[in-house]
Design a protein with these regions (language model features):
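Alpha-helical segment proximal to the catalytic Tyr-Lys
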Residues: 129, 175-179
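Active-site loop-to-helix junction immediately N-terminal to the catalytic Tyr of the SDR YXXXK motif
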Residues: 104, 152-160, 172, 196, ...
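Substrate-binding pocket helix/loop in short-chain dehydrogenase/reductase
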Residues: 100-101, 105-113, 208-211
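Residue(s) in the substrate-gating loop at a strand-loop-helix junction
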Residues: 146
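Conserved glycine-rich cofactor-binding loop
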Residues: 18-20
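Active-site helix of classical SDR
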Residues: 124, 162, 170
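Conserved glycine-rich Rossmann-like NAD(P)H-binding loop of the short-chain dehydrogenase/reductase
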Residues: 32-47
Length: 214
């Protein structure tokens, strides 16, 4: 392992760690030496954590509904207790709803904004408070934004709004926390072949052709 990427002894929480980008990011942190607690919406997260541990990594899984304020706090506190502290938070969990904008259900809008924007902000606050408790405050927060933070996409107004919010929230937190030793950054991936994007990777979907023909 290149020493530039050595995270031996570091302690991390990764939301959305059972699949997709969150799963890959969690494994990347573990490959670099970090101990990781992954959050997932179902008991499958326990199985995934066990699979990581079978590879020789330190990993624990916590099932949590990130839309639930109290459950978020309880899961965070449990993770910090398991890890014995916290150095890194990766907000990778997200949900998607697809409807033409004129018919987009308001409840779907609320659900997406809650999981994709409110939950990450809440967890950022929790992590920042934990980092500031240290004798020498420090820590790293990585929020997963999207190319749709900058381009609106099609039939996904709630997702685009949530990821635009993540990008701006990240800038705001960075402005406040950088001087306190806390780094806050965002990654904005393009289209990825994950469960969230199965509607786009179906070759029979006209949207697939619109994207790949560019």
């Amino acid at each position: 392992m290149n020493s530039l990427f050595d995270l031996t002894g570091k302690k991390a929480i990764v939301t959305g760690g059972t699949r997709g980008l969150g799963h890959g990011m969690a494994e990347g942190l573990m490959e670099a030496g970090a101990a990781v607690v992954i959050f997932g919406t179902s008991k499958k997260v326990i199985e995934v954590a066990a699979q990581f541990e079978a590879k020789g990594y330190w990993c624990k899984g916590i099932a949590v509904d990130l839309a639930d304020d109290r459950a978020r706090q309880e899961a965070f506190d449990q993770a910090v207790a398991l890890l014995g502290g916290l150095d890194i938070l990766v907000n990778a969990a997200g949900i998607q709803r697809r409807h033409p904008s004129p018919e987009f259900p308001l409840q779907d809008w609320k659900d997406v904004l809650n999981v994709n924007l409110t939950a990450p902000f809440d967890l950022c606050q929790m992590a920042a408070k934990e980092f500031l408790k240290k004798e020498q405050p420090c820590g790293k927060i990585v929020n997963i934004a999207s190319m749709l933070s900058f381009f609106g996409g099609m039939t996904v107004p709630a997702y685009a709004a949530s990821k635009g919010g993540v990008a701006q929230m990240t800038k705001a937190l960075c402005n406040e926390l950088a001087s306190k030793g806390i780094q806050v950054n965002a990654i904005a991936p393009g289209y990825m072949d994950t469960d969230m994007n199965v509607a786009l990777t179906d070759v029979s979907n006209p949207r697939y052709r619109e994207i790949t023909d560019r």
